[in-house]
Curated annotation (Swiss-Prot):
Pathway(s): Xenobiotic degradation; gamma-hexachlorocyclohexane degradation
Entry function: Catalyzes the degradation of 2,5-dichlorohydroquinone (2,5-DCHQ) into hydroquinone (HQ) via chlorohydroquinone (CHQ).
Something else known: The mechanism of this reaction probably involves a glutathione transfer: the halogen is firstly removed through substitution with glutathione, which is then removed by displacement of the aromatic moiety by a second glutathione molecule, producing oxidized glutathione (GS-SG).
Protein's name in the database: 2,5-dichlorohydroquinone reductive dechlorinase
Catalytic activity, as annotated: 2,5-dichlorohydroquinone + 2 glutathione = chlorohydroquinone + glutathione disulfide + chloride + H(+); chlorohydroquinone + 2 glutathione = hydroquinone + glutathione disulfide + chloride + H(+)
Originating organism: Sphingobium indicum (strain DSM 16412 / CCM 7286 / MTCC 6364 / B90A)
Gene: linD
Organismal lineage: Bacteria, Pseudomonadati, Pseudomonadota, Alphaproteobacteria, Sphingomonadales
SUPFAM superfamilies: GST C-terminal domain-like, Thioredoxin-like
Signal peptide: none
Entry's Gene Ontology molecular function annotations: transferase activity
Amino acid sequence: MSADTETLARKVREEVIKPEQSTLISPDRQSPSLLRREATVEPRFELFHFVFSVCSQKVRGTLMEKGVTFGSNELTILPPQSENYCPQYVRLRLRSEAAAKHRPVSSFTGQSSVDSEGFDPLVVPTLVDHETGRILADSKAICLYLCDALSGGTDLLPADIREAVLKQVQLADTTPHVALLYGADPDGDRRPESMQAVMPGIHAHKIDAVRRNIPLADGDPLLLEAYQHKIVKEEAAASFVINEPQMRTAISKAEQLVTDLDRDLGASTGPWLFGDRFTLADLFWAVSLYRFLWLGYSGFWKDGAGKPRVEAYANRLFARPSVKDAIIQWPGHPPSENVIHLLSNA
């Protein structure tokens, strides 16, 4: 690993991450209970993430399916803490491959995909590979990297169906999760009451948090530019989530994705999208379907929606160990009355 990458990662871990939020996750200990300072091994992979981030959930699930030990560094990304806005963390992401490859974020579409949004240096997750010195900061790219770099564990990207799996991964990656989280359904807010209570004015709070960090960017034009782009994005988001036509379009797109998923499941000869083989596509859909359920959008496939294949598929996904450990049971997940039955069956 390059000394520069090591220094950047260490500064975030030591100056931003709370000690109790820096833990070691291993195949035989998949909950964040072993403090990093008490661990006897230095992991190859180090993940900076947040419990509730769908992008973080995809990466956590991939790491667990591959059966690797990794360092877990949890950031609190909600205002007023907004630890993902700290200069140390933003500088780490600005050195990532995604920062060099993608245009800076400058708009809001309701998705979290780098392909549609551009690169946002102020979000999660970020993965550091201590063996190669690479810094990866796009969840889809991180998961593909792990699939190609690691031969052990579940073969999430089989060579003979790689392109078909990637097509499904891309579909799941374009789901407008962010819009459905921050914005209400104009025809009746379905989100948990606790979430409805904290969302009004959330983008203004995020912008304030960014502005508090701007003085720390003195002498660092790249960092300053990152903060400026973030403000533009959050201003656009604030307008998007109260625009009824845009919200209806986002909800309609999400429901159509589930309809298309039901069709694709009908072509499968097994429990997963590609027969008996659990792939990265299934993991990405697990994250999407769980978020829909959590938010109150399970009506996309339940309650007379006529999609029994998706309903059965979701139940299988939610029972999979990696999905339970990386998403459903990961400590600190915000409460939702829509998923209590899954937690009680844990």
